[in-house]
């Protein structure tokens, strides 16, 4: 089993548990240059809020889009957009990535902005 398939397997296991609980998820995806965050409905069919470093407004705020500072900006913005729609509590779906570095930075910024998980 290679590194990518192990990550996908971890993500599938976590998503299965969240689907059984029926909670709103804050899903992140990380690449070497960008980070993406989406708030997804419990049934998985609707994206309620989203933010990523690909957006022009966010990429203009940061010097480089693939670091912890950019992840913190994305976390803050996705939390603000979720709170605007009345979403206060979510389950954090890290998509099998380690809770470290940019993933941790995004989560901490979302918590500081008022999102609970």
Swiss-Prot record:
Gene3D superfamilies attached to this UniProt entry: 3.30.420.100
UniProt entry tagged with the keyword rRNA-binding: yes
GO biological process, one term: translation
Membrane-spanning intervals of the chain: none
Keywords: Ribonucleoprotein, Ribosomal protein, RNA-binding, rRNA-binding
Presence of keyword Cell membrane: no
GO MF term set: 5S rRNA binding; structural constituent of ribosome
One Gene Ontology term, aspect cellular component: cytosolic large ribosomal subunit
Signal sequence, start to end: none
Oligomer and partners: Part of the 50S ribosomal subunit; part of the 5S rRNA/L5/L18/L25 subcomplex. Contacts the 5S and 23S rRNAs.
PANTHER family assigned: 39S RIBOSOMAL PROTEIN L18, MITOCHONDRIAL (PTHR12899), LARGE RIBOSOMAL SUBUNIT PROTEIN UL18M (PTHR12899:SF3)
Summary of the function given for this chain in its UniProt record: This is one of the proteins that bind and probably mediate the attachment of the 5S RNA into the large ribosomal subunit, where it forms part of the central protuberance.
Similarity-based family: Belongs to the universal ribosomal protein uL18 family.
Protein name: Large ribosomal subunit protein uL18
């Amino acid at each position: 089993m290679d590194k990518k398939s192990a990550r996908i397997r971890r993500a599938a296991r976590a998503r299965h548990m969240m689907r059984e609980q029926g909670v709103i998820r804050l899903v992140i995806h990380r690449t070497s240059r960008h980070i993406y965050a989406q708030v997804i409905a419990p049934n998985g069919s609707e994206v309620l809020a989203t933010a990523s470093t690909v957006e022009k407004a966010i990429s203009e705020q940061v010097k480089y889009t693939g670091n912890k500072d950019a992840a913190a900006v994305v976390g803050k913005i996705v939390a603000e957009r979720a709170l605007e729609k009345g979403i206060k509590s979510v389950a954090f779906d890290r998509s099998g990535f380690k809770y470290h570095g940019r993933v941790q930075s995004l989560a901490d910024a979302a918590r500081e902005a008022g999102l609970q998980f």
